[in-house]
């Protein structure tokens, strides 16, 4: 009975702890996998994939915000990015957007097309936050030198790939959860 009690956002404590694990994984993977591909958005394949997977496994409203909030706080504490404390929003906004768009797809994130669409959309939301923070803080934005069009396409492709991979993982893991 205790595990069925709602803790936050109508999610159980066990679900919030699982989401915290996913959020931690996002920040740690971003810090550990610094692959110098020099392609904008290449980390979205991991990052957006984990967000979509967490939302697919625990579909309640707020799960994206919990994962985004946890990874954002860890990103600030680990000193990820050149935005200072504002790096939090790069992690939080994709989770918020995922919470807003998942109901439009009836939470069917185990469908590879839906997973890819959600991954692409939240990856683009991260790119827009990067752009807004760069303009607001007057940071050098290398991704603008190669063009916003290419940057948008690469974010879309990597986010979609992460979302599609997450869809297959959701199908495998959901029965075990």
Indicate residue ranges for each PLM-predicted region.
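Hydrophobic transmembrane alpha-helices
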Residues: 2-57, 62
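Membrane-helix interfacial "entry" motifs
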Residues: 3-7, 11, 15, 36, ...
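Alpha-helical transmembrane segments of multipass membrane proteins
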Residues: 22, 26-30, 51, 71, ...
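Juxtamembrane membrane-interface segments at transmembrane alpha-helix termini
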Residues: 53-59, 77-85, 100-107, 127-132
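Membrane-embedded alpha-helical hairpins and interfacial helices in multi-pass inner-membrane proteins
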Residues: 108-177
């Amino acid at each position: 009975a205790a595990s069925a009690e709602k803790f936050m956002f109508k999610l159980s404590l066990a679900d919030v702890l699982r989401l915290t694990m996913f959020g931690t994984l996002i920040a740690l993977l971003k810090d550990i996998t610094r692959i110098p591909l020099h392609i904008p958005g290449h980390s979205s394949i991991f990052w957006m994939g984990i967000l979509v997977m967490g939302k697919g496994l625990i579909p309640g409203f707020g799960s994206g915000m919990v994962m985004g909030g946890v990874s954002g706080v860890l990103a600030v504490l680990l000193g990820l990015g050149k935005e200072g404390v504002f790096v939090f929003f790069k992690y939080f906004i994709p989770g918020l957007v995922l919470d807003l768009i998942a109901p439009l797809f009836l939470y069917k994130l185990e469908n590879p097309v839906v997973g890819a669409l959600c991954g692409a959309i939240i990856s683009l939301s991260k790119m827009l936050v990067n752009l807004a923070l760069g303009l607001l803080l007057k940071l050098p934005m290398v991704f603008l030198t190669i063009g916003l069009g290419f940057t948008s396409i690469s974010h879309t492709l990597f986010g979609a790939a992460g979302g599609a991979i997450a869809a297959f993982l959701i199908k495998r893991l959901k029965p075990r959860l």
